[in-house]
């Protein structure tokens, strides 16, 4: 499996990472068996997935706690570990982010908050350093939280050896440039799938110009691109899938038809549609990292199968043409 450089950090890892939002549980995902989640993380690493991504907000610290438990059973040097900062519920700030499981969560990108976040995350994760630290959401008011001070705090943590690389999520092209102006930005994390390609217009060209890597989350479009969703599949009231444009009837029909047209390729590569989609997503953008969630060892094992798919050039061109035709 080929390793890909994370920006200019000097860290290199295979393209596929494990996202741990779901194992945090909470109202969004429901209860999980933590012992099963720990085994899922162990399985992911055993199968070649080396990047484990988490965040304090996932389950209000619970995801980090579960990842920390899993790390007790994994060689830390084999894992690239990322978490996030900038969302706060220890105290109020002028910027309300949202209410999560009945708790008011605020944005706080001050130096003090970032440093506190990192110290708390290191404790929960049971490690002495983070490989990547992302700012989870950006401030809507740079007068309140100057970006220069945010980046300065992260660079200080890097100098101290507490983080190895700096990342940012939910950004604009201008914000990427400003991060690079004030320090070294190595990677951004954004939503990207075969059906959601907005970042191709501005973010990807900016990242390519500045040597910033991209990590895509939700590559399977909330399950739509697994091949298991039909036109008759329904979701309970309040599910975010009901408001996702990709799940609306016309768009859903296009996606299902596209996937049905790739059945011969699943036979050729001895893989599932989900694995095929993950492999293609990684081919859509040179150097792209892809995050996939898993709550069970079997799901982690299945995701890792995408690492071993080597798409023929002609097949990749055919599939990209199909994707472009419905974009």
Q: Where does each model-flagged region fall?
A:
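N-terminal binding-site loop/beta-alpha segment at the start of enzyme catalytic domains
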Residues: 1-80
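Beta/alpha (TIM)-barrel catalytic core signal, keyed to glycine-rich beta->alpha loops juxtaposed to Asp/Glu
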Residues: 3, 138-327
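Acidic (Asp/Glu)-rich catalytic clusters
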Residues: 8, 70-76, 123-126, 179-183
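N-terminal small/glycine-rich loop or linker at the start of catalytic domains
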Residues: 9-28, 84-104, 134
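Structural preference for beta-strand elements that scaffold enzyme active sites
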Residues: 13-17, 50-51, 78-82, 129-132, ...
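Active-site mouth loops of central-metabolism enzymes
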Residues: 22-34, 100-115, 141-143
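Short, acidic/polar
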Residues: 31-44, 110-124, 172-177
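Active-site groove signature of glycoside hydrolases
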Residues: 122-141
């Amino acid at each position: 499996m080929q390793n890909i450089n994370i920006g200019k950090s000097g860290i290199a890892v295979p393209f596929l990472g494990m996202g741990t939002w779901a194992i945090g549980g909470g109202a969004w995902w429901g209860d999980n068996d933590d012992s099963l989640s720990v085994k899922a993380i162990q399985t992911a690493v055993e199968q070649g997935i080396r990047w484990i991504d988490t965040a304090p907000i996932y389950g209000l610290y619970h995801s980090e706690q579960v990842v920390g438990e899993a790390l007790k059973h994994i060689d830390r040097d084999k894992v690239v570990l990322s978490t996030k900062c900038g969302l706060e519920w220890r105290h109020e700030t002028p910027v309300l982010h949202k209410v999560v499981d009945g708790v008011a969560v605020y944005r706080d990108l001050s130096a003090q908050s970032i440093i506190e976040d990192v110290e708390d995350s290191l404790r929960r994760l049971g490690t002495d350093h983070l490989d990547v630290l992302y700012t989870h959401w950006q401030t809507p008011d740079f007068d309140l939280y100057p970006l220069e001070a945010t980046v300065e705090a992260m660079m200080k943590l890097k100098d101290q050896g507490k983080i190895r690389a700096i990342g940012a999520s939910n950004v604009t092209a201008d914000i990427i440039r400003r991060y690079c102006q004030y320090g070294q930005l190595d990677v951004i994390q954004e939503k990207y799938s075969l059906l959601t390609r907005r970042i191709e217009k501005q973010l990807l060209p900016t990242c390519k110009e500045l040597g910033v890597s991209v990590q895509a989350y939700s590559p399977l479009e909330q399950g739509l691109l697994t091949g298991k969703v039909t036109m008759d599949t329904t979701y309970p009231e309040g599910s975010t899938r009901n408001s996702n444009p990709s799940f609306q009837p016309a768009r859903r029909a296009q996606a299902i038809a596209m996937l049905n047209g790739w059945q011969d390729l699943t036979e050729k590569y001895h893989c599932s549609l989900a694995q095929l989609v993950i492999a293609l997503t990684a081919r859509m953008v040179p150097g792209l990292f892809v995050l996939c969630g898993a709550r069970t060892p079997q799901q982690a094992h299945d995701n890792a199968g995408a690492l071993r798919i080597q798409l023929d050039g002609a097949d990749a061109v055919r599939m990209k043409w199909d994707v472009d035709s419905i974009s």
